[in-house]
């Protein structure tokens, strides 16, 4: 019985503290052993191991997919409250433009926020920065899932 190729998209590396456990180089080796044609790294608010991961995948003959779980603040009508509630949007680069946009958004998430809040961007920060990106919205930490779970169907 033959299996259709499977591509894991939601792997957090050891660079995502307290959540990921695998070294990006080991991820590539394991992907080859398991017969995956491609594998994605998606660290939280970071691209820390992206270059190491891409090089290791290429050495193993595996297609690397670079992504991140980007924190996106929920809009708030209360002044000073934006950034207190952050949902996560998995974003993946499909080309060089997408990688450039990922780098910009991750940098913005860290540099343009109050230090008391976790790294995030505002939804409007995505405007003009979506070329070459693929977004998944069904994650358990995503806005749609969380809003539905909170009974806010009209906002989801």
List each language-model region with its residue ranges.
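Phosphodiester-processing cores and adjacent nucleic acid-binding clamps
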Residues: 1-156
């Amino acid at each position: 019985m033959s299996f259709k190729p499977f591509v894991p998209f939601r792997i957090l590396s050891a660079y995502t503290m307290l959540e990921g456990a695998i070294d990006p180089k080991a991820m590539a080796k394991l992907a080859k052993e398991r017969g995956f044609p491609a594998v994605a790294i998606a660290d939280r608010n970071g691209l820390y191991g992206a270059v190491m991961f891409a090089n290791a995948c290429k050495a193993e003959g595996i297609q690397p997919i670079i992504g991140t779980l980007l924190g996106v603040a929920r809009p708030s009508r209360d002044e000073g409250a934006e950034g207190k509630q952050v949902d996560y949007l998995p974003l993946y680069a499909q080309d060089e433009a997408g990688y450039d946009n990922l780098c910009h958004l991750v940098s913005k998430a860290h540099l343009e926020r109050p230090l008391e809040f976790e790294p995030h961007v505002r939804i409007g920060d995505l405007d003009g920065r979506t070329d070459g990106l693929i977004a998944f919205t069904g994650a358990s930490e995503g806005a749609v899932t969380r809003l539905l779970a909170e009974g806010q169907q009209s906002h989801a």
